[in-house]
């Protein structure tokens, strides 16, 4: 488990299925994710089983209230970890909308990036954001990511083609 000031990142468990179905079937939550709705219970259960079997560094994001009760608010992870080349792709979804815009994404990704560089010994973490998602783009910039490219009209979502902004962060840039 990774602990920050307001968030904790813990491994995914089978009983997270209910939250995953809720989050990833919510059009507002997934509007900048390229996913195919609806997500079924079977498909999400299979994904959880495969992810845990591969021991991928994918976590549920939790926050605790003043009484210490934990609430799951989203998920994050490092995907396609390549130990040979020292790189991975980062992703995050804050599924509980009442927690949007309060800095939970920044704190979560700070923990995840530290984990990637200091525990997994990565050299580089990559990420992408679809251009309409201004909040995600600002978050990447605040974390020190550098825009490395743009894939024009990379995905089709909600009746329009979206450009994908590609970001990268090297370990030595993170240490600064």
Feature-to-residue mapping (PLM):
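Acyl-donor (CoA/ACP) binding surface of acyl/acetyltransferases
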Residues: 1-12, 16-17, 58, 65-176
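Tryptophan-centered motif/residue detector
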Residues: 23, 47-48, 100, 174
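Conserved GNAT-fold acetyl-CoA-binding loop/helix
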Residues: 28-49
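DNA-binding alpha-helical recognition surfaces that contact promoter or target DNA
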Residues: 22, 46, 138, 142
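A short helix-loop-beta-strand connector motif used in the catalytic cores of GNAT acetyltransferases and
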Residues: 48-62
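Hydrophobic pocket/interface hotspot
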Residues: 20-21, 29, 44, 90
């Amino acid at each position: 488990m990774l602990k920050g000031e307001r968030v904790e990142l813990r491994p995914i468990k089978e009983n997270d299925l209910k939250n995953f179905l809720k989050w990833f079937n919510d059009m507002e939550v997934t509007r900048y994710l390229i996913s195919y709705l609806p997500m079924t219970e079977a498909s999400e259960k299979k994904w959880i089983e495969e992810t845990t079997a591969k021991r991928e560094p994918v976590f549920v994001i939790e926050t605790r209230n003043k009484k210490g009760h934990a609430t799951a608010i989203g998920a994050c992870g490092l995907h396609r970890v390549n130990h040979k080349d020292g790189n991975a792709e980062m992703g995050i979804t804050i599924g509980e909308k009442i927690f949007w815009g309060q800095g939970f994404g920044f704190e979560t990704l700070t923990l995840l990036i530290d984990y990637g560089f200091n525990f997994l010994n990565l050299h580089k973490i990559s990420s992408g954001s679809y251009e309409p998602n201004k909040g995600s783009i600002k978050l990447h910039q605040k974390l020190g990511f550098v825009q490395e490219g743009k894939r024009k009209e990379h995905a089709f979502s909600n009746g329009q083609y979206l450009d994908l902004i590609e970001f990268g962060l090297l370990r030595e840039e993170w240490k600064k």
